[in-house]
């Protein structure tokens, strides 16, 4: 571990030196790349620096206890020694986590797809509530949300919605939301007061740039048409809506949220790239299925990950056995406790596997 840490320190120092080179400063592409790498290494460098300082404090405290005759100074040194030893243990754990292999997609922006599942209109209402929950969470973090496409129902539900979230570390945080979400409550459409179980699926995909995924023009059909609202009424007198059909996969993308055909086309292609990149990522994940079974946030879209029980005001994440009784706050976007617990469980599983290896 410490060889890797020293290698990281050397790399950090090399980057810092390069950033002071006028030739690098004038090369904006290289400068930005180095700045990004330096920023990603900074937490590890800061933690390792504190670790080395604590180890030095332990040496100094032991020397005082060995050489000093003043009882008051020895008592202070003993207190400093105990504090430093405890902190060293914490820092060693933090360093192990920081040295875990990083998901190459963690720094990417994301495309989120929510689809109503079993439960008819109630499932569509739940899908719309999940959408609002994620929008509120993203806004609280200062992230930008951009709707790519959506299919609303007449009473405020959503059969499906696809949106982009732009913000630092969006994928690293939101990837744990992929899976089937289940709601248990008495639907507003239910006259006899029976509790119904409905579902909605969430897929969190890293945004794919053109360099990440190549789309051959001959594999795409582009149709333009007039945008329409609920019930099919025309909401635009120009052919601004865009539909993409990707022949090899059968994926169809429809975008009409913007007034400009060019903007709708850009959004449609962004969504298509994300879906194609996600297919490739899922293939790679499936090839490592055995290694992933013990991990949280594996992205298994069929996995029932969470239940929202309205009569009990309860939310349970089944992957980690976490139950919280603050459903109203969670539906309003307060999901950080759940995400933090998923991240911690994922890190613990990876550390355990690293220990086995």
Curated annotation (Swiss-Prot):
GO molecular function: translation release factor activity, codon specific
Annotated PROSITE patterns: RF_PROK_I
Cellular location(s): Cytoplasm
Pfam family, one: RF-1
Record PTM N5-methylglutamine, positions in chain: 233
Protein biosynthesis found in the keyword field: yes
Gene3D superfamilies found in the cross-reference section: 3.30.160.20, 3.30.70.1660, 6.10.140.1950
NCBIfam families: prfA, PRK00591.1
Family statement: Belongs to the prokaryotic/mitochondrial release factor family.
HAMAP family tied to this protein: Rel_fac_1
Name of the protein in question: Peptide chain release factor 1
């Amino acid at each position: 571990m410490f060889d890797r840490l020293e290698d990281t320190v050397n790399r950090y120092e090399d980057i810092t030196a390069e950033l002071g080179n006028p030739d690098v400063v004038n090369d904006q592409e290289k400068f930005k790349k180095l700045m990004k790498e330096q920023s990603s290494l900074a937490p590890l460098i800061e933690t390792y620096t504190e670790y080395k300082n604590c180890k030095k404090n332990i040496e100094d405290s032991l020397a005082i206890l060995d050489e000093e005759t003043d009882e008051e100074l020895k008592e202070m040194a003993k207190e400093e020694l105990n504090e430093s030893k405890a902190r060293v243990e914490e820092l060693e754990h933090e360093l192990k986590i920081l040295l875990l292999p990083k998901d190459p997609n963690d720094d990417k922006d994301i495309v989120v797809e929510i689809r109503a599942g079993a439960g008819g209109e109630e499932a569509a209402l739940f899908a719309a509530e999940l959408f609002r929950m994620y929008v509120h969470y993203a806004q609280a973090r200062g992230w930008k949300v951009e709707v790519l496409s959506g299919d609303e129902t007449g009473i405020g539900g959503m059969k499906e919605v696809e949106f982009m979230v732009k913000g630092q570390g969006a994928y690293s945080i939101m990837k744990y939301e992929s899976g089937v979400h289940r709601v248990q409550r008495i639907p507003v459409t239910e006259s006899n007061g029976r509790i119904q179980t409905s579902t909605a699926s969430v897929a969190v995909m890293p945004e794919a740039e053109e360099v990440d995924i190549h789309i051959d023009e001959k594999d795409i059909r582009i149709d333009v048409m007039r945008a329409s609202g609920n019930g099919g009424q025309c909401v635009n007198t120009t052919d601004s809506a865009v539909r993409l059909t990707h022949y090899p996969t059968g994926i169809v993308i429809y975008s009409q949220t913007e007034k400009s055909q060019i903007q709708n086309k850009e959004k449609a292609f962004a969504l298509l790239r994300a879906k194609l990149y996600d297919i490739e990522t899922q293939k790679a994940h499936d090839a490592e299925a055995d290694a992933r079974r013990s991990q949280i946030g594996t992205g298994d879209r069929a996995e029932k990950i969470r239940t929202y029980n309205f009569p009990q005001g309860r939310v349970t994440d089944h992957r980690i056995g976490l139950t919280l009784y603050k459903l109203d706050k969670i539906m309003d976007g307060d999901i950080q406790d759940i995400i933090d617990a998923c991240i911690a469980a994922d890190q613990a599983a990876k550390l355990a596997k690293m220990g086995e290896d």
